[in-house]
């Protein structure tokens, strides 16, 4: 039974069934309406500032106590890491990623790409992330680096891409490229979409059936196999000596840096191309190189890595060599290679692994000798295996570290001790033959060379007591006969570094650690490089021609097969994307370039009669928001095309000859003069335009001449001009509508009555750019620095254009719609389609970045969203298009590969969401919601509290730092300003109220108040 609402003065009382009275927390005092109530003042508003920059006084000891008690930095003493193999650094959140991606400059000829071993198009994938196009980003990454997920986790970017980043010298430093890469591929992984071979690679010659052997299933081998599989080779076999693939990523690098699930997913992606992996097959044990040749394998890739530990005996002193031989008998001595393999087998469960072994049991003080990545992996693992103290001792100084920053800094944060300039002399043993200490000599710089890299022992002897020792002096090739035939030195194989081909055998190629490759990403590139030259070797052997310039196929899935063709005004298009009549279509060469990129149509820059020819002022294009912000919104006072009408006619003939299947749309403007419109139509009659757009909406410059917007704000004029034009031509006519007229549907109706087949919604909105505080424009015209109201475009225009698209689609369904206005991302594009548009005109996005990158993002995003929307499994798991559910990485949802159901065509989704846009009076009032704050996600910043207190209903209580704000449901009206102002995605969500809700009127309204608004909404019951 609903609670009864009683009115007593201005207070609202709830009387429940048990007669217990509840008073509203924020009830008004009729005698002090301009003051907060006592409870609001004392419990809510007490934390709100009223004076700023007022000096304060606080004892230093109080500050010190606070800083110690609430330290949120990543430092620790290592002890809490015991037994925990969780990721060191949590996966970057989507919100963090979008902010970081926005910080990227998207440099042309990007230095980061040149610094990337696999030459990933970093600019493009970061732009895709900026637009939340996860598939586009992942496709871009995986096209060049098939192991993009584990490389994102392990890439030493401080030595590669980030080292060359153009913002590396700034306060925030280089872009976190590896973190962005990992997130994009991880989200794609959760989509569960299979890699397939590009279906265009069919009817290949029999040479593509040549047997190919790949030895080892590590990063270089998996990369090589992937590209061979993508090229179309059907008979690729990997022979792996252990029971799972992935190489050191799966078997040695610790779980906290490289989770096994990600590495095995990458192995599975290789198998999806038809590559066969044979486990527990070792070269030298189960087969020989001669065996492979005799079995018909035409080419072999060797990616076995360095399988044996460097004992440290060769080249060392006699004392150290003898002590190493003795140490190998001690149970507390470990080679790093064996140590990490044992840890990996015990901790990283998965794949075809059958027998699990115990991890090494450590305690006390562990000393690690060496300072490479492997040594630090051992040191950090030691903490997790029970060590109370870990020391890394190394021969040189910190400036000569072999380890990269990405692993050294986390090791330092974990409390590992570092002893530099320590050259090991020998191990010391106790009576039981166990190592009890390591004896060192100070190995100091000699200062007699320019680089200060020469060191010498100084006979300053010291010992470091220990309970365990891990010796990490690197690894070497196995001492086997086949290795000796390929060696160029005592440690590495001899190859042509341009092709990865061995000098001993023309049919053999090698990559990875065995040839001295320094890191995981370089190993992937070795395999990638070898794949092309293996392909070249095989094809030329079979008499086939191979291009001199490598042409490697990229990453491909079912998403790339999604049909995004459309039809508008009876004209078919392969995709809905085209360039608007704007600066990007200033000339025909620019339009031709857009066609080469993939845009399916272009609207030429607006042409006028010669008598109306214009001359532009300079400068005339500017940023509408603060120029310091990289927001995709522009303003302009550019007029119509300065080129002659004849240029646009003659050029149309030439471009349609070269691009007969592309759609070319003319754009015309004239005054409200029938003869002018008849003349201009007759002058373009020989131009092979597929459609003609009438520009009745240019908001500046032409308006003063009685053209553009001057003709487009009166439905009668729109109808007249349209009818004059349609009476002279059979070409479909489009009317470009102004956003300045309140009811776009009335203008669209008039255009349709005049014979138009479509409307473009919309042109730009006139506005002024912010000047400097002294009133001078940022980029004014002439000596006077004058400015004029100009057309505002991009993101700032989109809300208005989208609303007009909805209105026209609902009220004038008989007319087709070209959407135009802030279409920056694929998300925007699909929203316009859902709201009734059939084709999408692009401008600001291309002004902000190159047309090719923009098209790639738009196309892949639209395809991915359409695919994901049709995938019922993804929808069931909470995906919104390709946008993953909140905290997807913790949901443990299966990533089993599953095809989408039939993906609808674009014309099937046009207008599909119009019913979601409703007048307010028709919206449900039966569910009143209140915010719910997630304690796990809340940063305790108080932003929601501030917004609610000064711009809401004083319904959030906040007791200061280190406290999660508390929602006062009795006073909450469900406005959701807290959600809008929260800086953390999904930290606050709206849920149905648990209490009844009655609107607080302050003073009860008179009897004129509609009774339907004097209601109490009960709690919603699901």
What are the roles of these predicted feature ranges?
Residues 36-40, 48-49, 74-89, 537-562, ...:
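Alpha/beta catalytic cores of nucleotide-metabolism and tRNA/nucleoside-modifying enzymes
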Residues 63-90, 119-130, 140-142, 169, ...:
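Beta1-alpha1 glycine-rich phosphate/pyrophosphate-binding loop at the start
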Residues 106-131, 150-184, 275, 832, ...:
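Iron-sulfur cluster-binding cysteine motifs and their immediate structural context
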Residues 325-363, 448-522:
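FAD-site-proximal beta/loop scaffold in flavoenzymes
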Residues 593-596, 671-818, 826-842, 919:
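Alpha/beta enzyme core
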Residues 614-629, 770-789, 833-834, 845-871:
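C-terminal helical cap(s) of enzyme catalytic domains, especially alpha/beta-barrels
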